[in-house]
Amino acid sequence: MTTATTKKGWADRLADGMEVMAPIFDQPHLASIRDGFVAMMPLLIIGALVLLILQFPCSLAEGSNCYLGDIMDQDLAAKLWVPFSATYGLLSVFVTISVSYALAKRRGLDPVMPVIFTFLAFMLVAAPRLTGYDAEADQFLDNTGLFTAIVVAVISIEVFRFFVKRNLVITMPAGVPPAIANAFIALIPGFVIVFGWWIIRFLLNFDLAGGLFVVLSKIVPVASTYTAVAIAETIHAFLWTMGIHGDLTIGIALQPIWTANLAANAQAVANGLAPTAIYTSEFRSYVVPGGSGATLPLAFYFIRSKAPRLRRVGWLGIWPGIFNINEPITFGAPVVFNPVLAIPFILITFINATVAYLAHVLHLVTPTFIAAPWTLPSPLLMFMMTGFDWRAAVLAVITEFVIPGIIWWPAFKAWEKQVLEKEKVEVPAAAAPARA
């Protein structure tokens, strides 16, 4: 009697890895923060379109600082800045709404009233000047209030849920329309949320937004140092080799920092200053071009492989890889639980992060300040996200093809040899007649 064993496909391996990390990915607060920031991408891209237009170079001469916004009608240019100010200038407001909405949905709440009260609470905490009470108070409505937005959103929604879950609300008879019933249900928790934050900000005079800004102004630069970048990206690559979604894992912790850095760069450019923050989610396109591990050269090698199985994997992975999606390679080669491919996968990520960071430190490329769809081919993507800096496209070619191409080649040959030897054993065994 024989027992058939079925090999798991790359999709099954991905599902297994995701199952291991499910408790982290599905933790309501972390998942809501992640989903809230991801939902901001359309707003960031729309605001970035203004920068793309106004920062379009009008001269290709070396050292020229002439941009389209400088030579067009200045009244029109001023009006074009309005969409930028309405997106990046109110970024923390939108994050408050987005995170609170995501958390309210995860907590099983009708999100309309919880989100409204959370928005009001954030405005009390982050923009007291708008109330007319303190005309000198700082406002934290742009990227400077991102972490305040997270804190206010999470606490406010949990307070709302506390009252609803324990039925500490005003309930209406069964025949009352749902919209009216929900309005009365929201009354008590909404009162507690609004006046709770009012007490903290105005009676106790505790400036949460200002305090968080001071603290995080120390933390964010540390989290953006080379050491932090190298550690985070190496961990990200290692997790992928274990079948765990590395991008989601580190993104849960670092997405707010990436977004804050990108928004700070965009604001700097809008104010006529040079962008300085290096570690953004857009910077990571230098680190993981073609997908984590920069596997696009490996896909090309697979296509020319002597092993039929690797050729199939190569053709499956080459087209998604051009658009920075490489799960067919990661789980089809496989890289997962395969030291022959896992070691270069991690090494390439580390080297790419090092080379890209060093290029920024030496001022060889412009830091990213424009949000763009990450599925664009990496050289084009980096050219756009740096405000048409051709050097960024060159660096992207180096980190996508040159460095990975050199490192993947010996690993590919070693793995191809193992696959061919295995196929030589399996083919005769399959062709052998069964014994009577």
Regions found by a protein language model. Name each.
Residues T2-I24, A266-A274, A299, L316, ...:
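Transmembrane alpha-helical segments and their short flanking loops
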Residues F25, V93-L103, L120, N271-P339, ...:
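Alpha-helical membrane segments and immediately flanking helix-loop junctions
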Residues L14-F37, L76-A77, P173-A181, P328-T330:
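Cytosolic juxtamembrane amphipathic/interface segments immediately preceding
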Residues A22, D26-R166, V336:
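Early transmembrane hairpin of solute transport permeases
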